[in-house]
Amino acid sequence: MAYTKLIVAAAALAAMGSVSAADESAALPPAFVWKPVPGLVWKTVGSARIENGLLIAELDKVGDAYAQAEIDLSAYDRKPYEIAATVRAENIVDARQAYLGYRFAVNYLDMSMGGNRTWPSGRRIVGDYGPGETHFIDRTEKVRRKAFIQVGICSARGRVTCDLSTLRIREAQPLVPKRNVGYKVKYPGRVKNLPRMRGVMLGNVKGDAWDNLQAWGANLVRYQFAILGTGPVTNFEAYAEGFRANTMKELDNITATLDAAKAHGMMVVLDAHYACGGSCSKELGDPIDWSGDWRVFHDKRFAKLFAWSWQKIAERCKGRTDVVYGYDLMNEAHHTSPAAEGCDLVGLQEKIARAIRMIDPDTPIIVESMYCDPGWFRSLSAIGLDNVIYQVHLYYPHDYTHQGILTSASDVYCWPDPKMGWDKDFLLKSLKPVIDFQKEHEAKMFVGEFSAIAWAPNAEGYIRDCIRIFEELGWDWTYHAYREFPGWSVEHEATSRGKGTENFRPSKDNPRKRVLLSGLRGELAPGGVTGKGRGR
């Protein structure tokens, strides 16, 4: 009887996830047609078991139960790929982190990043799903070796079944069509002739913050602001009403920031740090393939509302090019599923930029790649407008910069690390897609964020190497962050590894602070230019 149930369950799962290979083959280039993944040797972890090709992972207490197999991804070197299978998830609960719980994902050694193991996040599922098709999509362009696929439950409880015979793979289709190839960005003399801009990222700082930054030698700040709606996003009108009201309130904060910066000889990047409508999730009724994507890329109502808020900011800031460095449209924006028509990463940024230009034709617009990640510059398109600055964030290697935050506090990574291949040259190679983009489009580049957590061994050396590279490349930059989380603050030292405030103490002088101040004064530029951060 149990055997019969398993066969019926497997057949039901396969039927639910079936695709018409003939139809797909006729409609798609060969690279984008699904292919089977033969020869996988599965090993089970915990109580997971495989019976007649059906994986069964079931836990009534939080734990691990999954199957794992090594998978050869060499055919997808520097290409995005996706893997699919037919699964059913039931009552997945008690996952402590978004990346835990239901597991359908791949991890691998990233040979393009020194060989460190990388764990791209799969789709998050809580509660019930299916039976139906599930996807893991890795849209990065990396060299992947020693890859393992995992299916089941990780640090949660519930039940997952997967028909392993339905597992298939293909090259992932481009999310954002390439456009404006070879477009050369032009800049007015006012922007081209700015001195090298160096500074920090901050929020609504108070007290002696501005005097302090001026004494440090900063001439640029990246001001992060958050405009949110009220009520659930599922009630758009209520959310939009609150969002509009909060936009009008934020205008006064922006004005105060610009006035303070001008009084202290600085310029301001206006950074819309959080997305209108937040992120999509299954719990909010969104399709599971949208999970984690910014809502503005899938729902045109929120995209239009976001553009409206930027127009209001432009109305307030028009004519202040002496203090506004640029309108930073999005912060680490991303979507891993196809966007609504005209609302993909590049398309939406261009629409917002054009909406701003109707009001303020003079202030630079700041545009970014997916996640603001260097690797995504390989597929980034210029938006076809002049006076646009392109932004990148640098947290490579992430295992080093964020050790103890997204990884165990006991995992210690060093800088440099010859065994891992991590050094200044590694950082420069990581930025090659950005450098290539800059050359193709003759674009002005801005590094909006870079840092290393306070307890990282030789964090000051990492910060020094970053700044020297930016200076050699002629890029403006802002350090993450000023008077925010103590772990990034150079006015604090870590007494132990941990995110709690008890793990830090105030510090008037420390190696990280000395390096940052040296950078702000221009002393890390080629030739060691000095003088209030205004050196070229």
Predicted regions located by residue number:
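Active-site mouth of glycoside hydrolases
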Residues: G182-P364, S369-F377, N387, P486, ...
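Extracellular glycoside hydrolase catalytic/binding regions
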Residues: W308-Q311, E315-Y325, E332-W475, T495-P506
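Aromatic-rich peripheral "rim/lid" segments of glycoside hydrolase catalytic domains that contact
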Residues: P177-G182, P457-R536
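Short beta-strand segments enriched in hydrophobic/aromatic residues
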Residues: A85-A89, V106-Y108, T140, I153-S155, ...
